[in-house]
Amino acid sequence: MQVTVEKPETGLEHKINVTLPAGDLDSKVEQRLAQMRRTVKMDGFRPGKVPMSVVKKRYGGQVRQEMMGETVQQSFYDAVAKESLNIAGYPQFQELDEKDGHIVYSATFEVFPEVELPKFSSLKVETVTSEVTDKDVEKMVTRLREQKMAWKPANGNKKAKEGDQVIIDFVGKKDGEEFEGGKAEEVPLELGSGRMIPGFEDGIIGMKKNEEKTIEVTFPEDYQSDELKGQTVTFDITVHSVQTKVLPEIDEEFVKSFGIEEGTEEALVNEIRSNMEKELKRSVENKNRTAVLDALAEKVEVELPQAMVDQEASALMERQLEQFQQQGLKAEDIGLTAEAFKPEAEKRVKIGLVLGEVIKEYKIEATDEARQAFIQDQASSYEDPQEVIEWYAKNPQAQKEIDAILVEKEITNKILSEAKTKEVSKSFEEIVSPAA
């Protein structure tokens, strides 16, 4: 095999030219056809007795094409290994030809860039700290009660306010004529939920049971119906009932409904606090890890392999499409392109390259002890921890994902021990449920 490499003065793209004997390919084709002959079935012949000439005539072209692909792929990776080239992404093959008893082809590809790490002491990182307060726990208890709340009809004189639920009929009209989809009966609507177009729920506030009213609203410019977007219409509203929230008492039945067999309010509060503290710990670690990696990547100037960026952008787009499709949206209606995900893809590829260099330079790896401790911590949040532990034991890919988390954690700790840090205290809500 003859190999020549064309290296640019700048940039990551290389070109490799390869020449190899076609005899190797001929030999592989003969071997594959001989294997096929043993099992191939054709009318008029017993299994395994089809003449080789017939097998060649029927399958020779297809097999040669398959063997050519395998040969080119294998020889390419042998060639780049011989030249000590560390390729990034997939190669593009060109100029494939057979002549004078040789297979000749070229391939262009990118190589991984050299990454020069900054001194960690030069980094400035803003980290967050937080704690679960009694008020946070009280809010969570209230949310749990709201999950199991009931609606109770109020007396006939009560005026509907935000947070109440009304049972209504409505008829929508445009220029005095009813429009399609604008009419419904006995609809439950929580005021302030934002379910309806702007102004609709506000127009019902202050109404009482059996009251009728006509309100005027304007559909948003981005409304899905072309006939209605931006149009001002009226709705005839009839209120059948005004209902208020009734929260359940924190009694034994309520507590046990969350799987807490003690059935006491104290046990519920302790369980909630424990879960919130675990969630907060994970969120703080994630935010601080992200801050560290962003600060590190910002200090590094490196050319990114475009093939890796394109692959990452496509993967991000596919992931987003899957989420939209799970919501019932059609891919063709969404109009997503990989180009829209390029900035995020570039950031991820850059962080990946920098992390790889840190791992290599400082010989960082996940230990078995750390992996087992991580699994134990994850399992403790489940009803049957042993089942979770056994699941991880049977899933090597899940263990690799844990190793990646642990390595990033060790890198984060190492950088934080040397970098200039500024600690900012934030509330549980700010950390766990930041505003969009």
Swiss-Prot record:
Q: Name one GO biological process term.
A: chaperone-mediated protein folding
| GO annotation, cellular component aspect | cytoplasm
Q: State which Enzyme Commission number(s) the record gives.
A: 5.2.1.8
Which reaction(s) are listed as its catalytic activity? [protein]-peptidylproline (omega=180) = [protein]-peptidylproline (omega=0)
Q: Which GO terms describe its molecular function?
A: peptidyl-prolyl cis-trans isomerase activity; protein folding chaperone; ribosome binding
Q: Entry's PROSITE patterns?
A: FKBP_PPIASE (PS50059)
Is Cell cycle among this UniProt entry's keywords? yes
Q: What class of enzyme is it?
A: isomerase
Q: Please state where this protein is localized.
A: Cytoplasm
The lineage's top-level taxon is Bacteria
Claim: Magnesium is one of the keywords in the record: no
Read off the HAMAP family from this record: Trigger_factor_Tig
| Membership in a protein family | Belongs to the FKBP-type PPIase family. Tig subfamily.
Its domain comment says: Consists of 3 domains; the N-terminus binds the ribosome, the middle domain has PPIase activity, while the C-terminus has intrinsic chaperone activity on its own.
Q: What does this protein do?
A: Involved in protein export. Acts as a chaperone by maintaining the newly synthesized protein in an open conformation. Functions as a peptidyl-prolyl cis-trans isomerase.
Q: What is this protein called?
A: Trigger factor
| UniProt source species | Hydrogenovibrio crunogenus (strain DSM 25203 / XCL-2) (Thiomicrospira crunogena)
- The record's gene field reads tig
